[in-house]
UniProtKB/Swiss-Prot annotation:
It comes from Yersinia pestis. Modulates RecA activity. This is Regulatory protein RecX. Belongs to the RecX family. Keywords: Cytoplasm.
Amino acid sequence: MNDQLSRAMRLLSQRDHSESELRRKLAAPPFSAKGNWGKRSGAKSSDVVESNLVESNPVESNLAESNAIEESDPQVIEQVIDYCYQHNWLDDSRFAASYINSRSRKGYGVQRIRSELMQKGVDKERILAAFENSEIDWCQLAKEVAQRKFSETLPVEWKEKAKVQRYLLYRGFFQEEIQSIYTDSVE
């Protein structure tokens, strides 16, 4: 459990994670300096001989297998997740709030952020609560994103307006927020 707990602490020290994201990362085998994912196809013959010797040693391979099984044991992962919750290192609500703030600063709208949070395993109730608690003016954000991409004065021709609209829809803004850009500029 200590290895998994140290992995969880390292992951959570870098940034907040959702529970399902952390669970998935803990279940995956960790990267290893001894792994063959970084070796080139033109390896020296001595490297191949050494790797064959390690693989042919049944004691070492059994130890490695038992460590790998222990590492991805669902009970151990569940204990680590519980420990993280008890120490307030893991919180899906906090993760959702920080993710919304981060992605909105990068110019993404509600629909895109909601979709990404659902992909990361955050449940709908927490996502909805996080959006309700956020103090982001989505109409103003849509206007700023459009002005940053196109120009300070937004286009008025139909063809150019359609381009702005497609871009903002792609970024995850609602149709009403996009329309408010032009109604606010007329008034």
